[in-house]
Regions:
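FIC/Doc superfamily catalytic core
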Residues: 1-131
């Protein structure tokens, strides 16, 4: 697998700010280290090369931000959009309904589904873009 296009801290902070501007919520980064940890996880999966693919790495972005809770508000939104942006940057298009996506992220945040389940959700709701 070729090296993916990664989401960095600046990208995640910009996404978070934009999502708060669009949908409201309290601004602010609660813990930079938790954000950095969430953003490093997909890259570690890639380096370990133990079967992780683009979908698993997108899940790692989403789960990392949702569960680490690095922001004061908007962690689920930011985690979801970060994962989807990662997919888009790497040649995939997300096709699930807004309702299905929201439900999956809420279940992930609540612990009702695990990362493998969320990856399965993504796999059935992304298509590879034509080159």
């Amino acid at each position: 697998m070729k090296k993916p296009v990664w989401i960095d801290e600046r990208d995640a902070l910009a996404l978070h700010s934009r999502l708060l501007a669009l949908h409201g919520g309290a601004g602010g980064l609660r813990d930079r280290g938790l954000l950095q940890s969430a953003l490093a996880c997909p890259q570690q999966q890639f380096a370990d090369a133990e079967g992780a693919d683009i979908i698993d790495m997108a899940t790692a972005y989403t789960a990392g931000i949702v569960r680490n809770h690095p922001f004061v508000d908007g962690n689920k939104r930011t985690g979801f959009v970060t994962g989807i942006l990662f997919l888009e940057l790497n040649g995939y298009r997300f096709v699930a309904s807004e309702e299905d996506a929201a439900q999956a992220v809420l279940q992930l945040a609540a612990g009702s589904i695990d990362e493998a389940d969320y990856s399965s959700f993504l796999r059935s709701n992304v298509v590879r873009r034509r080159k």
